[in-house]
Amino acid sequence: MFVDNIKLKVKSGKGGQGCVSFRREKFVVKGGPDGGDGGKGGDVIVECDKNTHTLSHYKGRKLLKAKNGRPGEGRKKHGANGEDLILKVPPGTVIKNAETGEVLLDMKEDGERKVLLEGGRGGLGNWHFRGPRNQTPRYAQPGEEGQELEIVLELKLIADVGLVGFPNAGKSTLISTLSNARPEIANYEFTTLTPKLGVVRVDEYRSFVMADIPGIIEGAHEGKGLGIEFLKHIERTSTILYMIDLSSYRDPVYQFKTLQKELKEYSEKLASRDYAIALTKCDSVEVEKIEEFFEKLGISKTEPKFKADPNLPCHFDDKTFVLPISSVANINIEALKFALFDLVEKNKRKENEENSF
């Protein structure tokens, strides 16, 4: 479990100014006041959206504002209301007051909409202030100020994709290339000593969460190396990406079979989870080494998808994919991102169907 926090300021719109106006028409010498009311300022509304998976689209945004109401006009015309600010958040997001820590909203259901801050009321036009003693009021109300608040959006994340590989297989480099995570990276084993999560953005609203897990060694299920502790972290991931280091002294097929064995020894359920294979550091070996991996495991080569490099062997089907990549040389990184997102979405749909029965 990983908690994503975003702190930002939000402000509702100011109400529009009331209008000072008098009726001016032919043959009407002393028309009375007819100034319209200002429009209401826009609200700050939080909307729960199941198609939004993370809070990454709010990163780096310090202040978000709803629109102000428009001023009133003559002939008692009401000013237009300001446009609401809609904050789209994934289910499970909690909104807190940044200063006090008080929970303001708890968003759970898809489609749920709640007003966080109301916009300011529009000012009254001068026609409201006419009376026997003052039939030509030359003042109108100003619009009410909007409300401003610093909030914290908090979301508990479970990784969609767990990266599984031997130490120094390129997991940290990949997650830092694809996401906003910045793990420590160096050319020695066991750089990653704790699991790190990164949010991989596919577009403005779609994203998935990737976990960089400490490298597995033989005997991990017995607690060797960093052992059982990190295997717990991938139990709840929906998809496993095996990271096979083509430049390693360990044979690629041996790496894959050993990693599968370690997961199976720890948990049959974990080993049976949907997976894909990334053949890392492909720029450091000849194509023949990649083809040899395909042949030894009986993997058929298919047409590339997601604009993968057509000069490198790859495999795509409805359940999995095998893709050579290089984070450093930026080979097939975009293809990997879209292929993983496609796999994660398929797994989520399958899980929802199973839970509905």
Curated annotation (Swiss-Prot):
CDD domains: Obg (cd01898)
Major subcellular site: cytoplasm
GO molecular function, one term: GTP binding
Signal sequence coordinates: none
A Pfam family this chain is assigned to: GTP1_OBG
Subcellular location: Cytoplasm
Binding annotation for Mg(2+): S172, T192
Membrane-spanning intervals of the chain: none
Name of the molecule in the record: GTPase Obg
Native source organism of the sequence: Nautilia profundicola (strain ATCC BAA-1463 / DSM 18972 / AmH)
UniProt lineage: Bacteria, Pseudomonadati, Campylobacterota, Epsilonproteobacteria, Nautiliales
